[in-house]
Amino acid sequence: MSDRVYLRAIDIDRYLPHRRPMRMVSEVLDYADQQVRCRCRIEADNPLLEDGSFPARGGLELLAQTSGLLLGLTQQDAEQRVAGIVQVKSFRLQAVHVPVAADCIVQARLLAGNLDAAQFEGEAYYNEQEFFAGTLMLAQLLKETT
């Protein structure tokens, strides 16, 4: 599915609980068969900034948000619940200067799992240079009962 009109219609707010300034996923560029590619914007008020730049380890949050979006997209008919990182299986960092107002491209692929818990792998790029790659597991949190 690479129809840009359809992709722009994806309501990211429906799938991610994050709001500005923490939500960095700004656009879905491509989505097909258990993988997604997103644009992520690094804003000046981003809480992860260090000395005016986005650290490579922040790629973990970019991958988590992109993976959470993918989890929601693959389960569109199910009730949406908040998910969190429960395990980081592996990661690789590269020293890359990612400035404020940068657009990063993040790819995520669903490796295994279901709506309750799933494993993803992916990469984050700035200017076509990979600065983060990793594998993580997300689990949806239990719905609070009263």
List PLM regions with ranges.
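Small-residue-enriched segments and motifs
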Residues: 23-26, 86, 91, 106-108, ...
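Short coil-to-beta-strand transition motifs
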Residues: 17-24, 98-104
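Hydrophobic beta-strand-centered segment that forms part of the acyl-chain substrate-binding groove
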Residues: 5, 69-105
